[in-house]
Swiss-Prot record:
MF GO annotations: biotin transmembrane transporter activity
Keyword Transport: yes
Chief place of localization: membrane
A GO cellular-component term linked to this record: plasma membrane
Family statement drawn from the similarity comment of this UniProt entry: Belongs to the BioY family.
Location relative to the cell: Cell membrane
Transmembrane segments: 19-39, 57-77, 85-105, 123-143, 154-174
Keywords: Cell membrane, Membrane, Transmembrane, Transmembrane helix, Transport
Domain of life the protein comes from: Bacteria
Name of the protein described by the UniProt record: Biotin transporter BioY
Pfam families for this protein: BioY
Function of the molecule: Probably a biotin-binding protein that interacts with the energy-coupling factor (ECF) ABC-transporter complex. Unlike classic ABC transporters this ECF transporter provides the energy necessary to transport a number of different substrates. The substrates themselves are bound by transmembrane, not extracytoplasmic soluble proteins.
Assembly description: In E.coli forms a stable energy-coupling factor (ECF) transporter complex composed of 2 membrane-embedded substrate-binding protein (S component), 2 ATP-binding proteins (A and A' components) and 2 transmembrane proteins (T component), probably with a stoichiometry of 2:1:1:2. May be able to interact with more than 1 S component at a time.
The encoding gene: bioY
Amino acid sequence: MTNNQKVKTLTYSAFMTAFIIILGFLPGIPIGFIPVPIILQNMGIMMAGGLLGPKYGTISVGAFLALALIGLPVLTGGNGGAASFLGPSGGYRIAWLFTPFLIGFFLKKLKITTSQNWFGELIIVLLFGVIFVDFVGAIWLSFQSNIPLLTSLISNLVFIPGDCIKAILTVVIVRRLRKQGGFELYFRK
């Protein structure tokens, strides 16, 4: 990687971290029957893997989560600190760390970023940005809130329609940005 590419990578990674933080300024929508709101930050998490690939997408999200963990109010609703990782939403946040890696890895492995296969990219984003995150989040919610696992899984179905819309928007935006150039570096072998 040349010095110019290193600077570009650092800039893109910092921008992605900032973008995820900005999405947290938009208030969450409380659902009522479970203590986890509908938020937009997960869209930024999905975008990190699709734009920056497995390595730099994970670094970007890891930086965001580290800022949240040390107490900066970067999570939706101005939350931060270790308690926000131990509460009802903790499982989703833990899954977020793995999401850009999984999305980026499979996009790279299947060479979907260089093809016109937007549907294949959508399937990968749905699998790892929606189903994986909601599944891990539901398991955590079950244990943390003492809710039966089946009840927790069923209650998470409320997130699926909105998360699917966010996944579609993510694929459309990411493919458009990738078409502009500069991101192909992150999907080379």
